[in-house]
Amino acid sequence: MSVHEVNHPLVKHKIGLMREAGISTKKFRELTSEIASLLAYEASRDFQIEPRTITGWDGSKVGIQQLKGKKVTVVPILRAGIGMLDGVLDMIPNAKVSVVGLARNEETLEAHTYFERFVGNLDERLALIIDPMLATGGSMAATIEMLKNNGCLQIRVLCLVAAPEGLARITAAYPEIDIYVAAIDERLNEQGYILPGLGDAGDKIFGTK
């Protein structure tokens, strides 16, 4: 599979607005959700459809198209992934929600799990993992492993900003997984933050420091 950087003018404009140092919590949340919707649109481009006949407004039969047999679970990585959830559900409202809680060790930059709750029948579902920042790739790799260990066979990743280091880690370990990203930035700093990045997305979404 591959990395898909969404080079749409609206996506690039919105990501640019998110980089402003003085952006408000309200605006950051709104833009996170809006970009998440656009990423979900791109990630669902290959969903199959099938014909169906319905009764139209005037009582006549109307042929329409509907999604065919695609069961989706959206998997936000706590806590920042919650900021993308509504945007994805706006596009795929029937999706089930699974949750993974991970915290990063600031010394090793690796993730440890403190919570997980998956929907049933993961082997029949496409999992869309959502997390605004793909930095070292530690949290993403841990989430992918948890999904695989619980039987999930189809996984895609949606994130706002990714560092080359994180992308390299995930694509090397999981070449079968598609990654949809709004922007690929320059690098990580010594603390594992993406540059130029967005800062701490969790703090900006939740209004904490």
Swiss-Prot record:
Keywords attached to this Swiss-Prot or TrEMBL record, sorted alphabetically, are: Allosteric enzyme, Glycosyltransferase, GTP-binding, Magnesium, Nucleotide-binding, Transferase
Source organism of the structure: Geobacter sp. (strain M21)
What is its pathway?
A: Pyrimidine metabolism; UMP biosynthesis via salvage pathway; UMP from uracil: step 1/1
* Residues where uracil binds: I194, G199, D200, A201
Residues engaged in binding 5-phospho-alpha-D-ribose 1-diphosphate: R79, R104, D131, P132, M133, L134, A135, T136, G137, G138, S139, D200
Q: How is the cofactor bound?
A: Binds 1 Mg(2+) ion per subunit. The magnesium is bound as Mg-PRPP.
Q: Which NCBIfam families match?
A: PRK00129.1, upp
Per the entry, which co-factors are needed? Mg(2+)
Known regulation of activity? Allosterically activated by GTP.
Q: Which family does it belong to?
A: Belongs to the UPRTase family.
What SUPFAM superfamilies does the annotation carry?
A: PRTase-like
Catalytic class of the enzyme: transferase
Asked if the Swiss-Prot or TrEMBL record annotates the protein with the keyword Phosphoprotein, the reply is no
**Catalytic reaction equation(s):** UMP + diphosphate = 5-phospho-alpha-D-ribose 1-diphosphate + uracil
Q: Which GO terms describe its biological process?
A: UMP salvage; uracil salvage
This protein is called Uracil phosphoribosyltransferase
E.C. code? 2.4.2.9
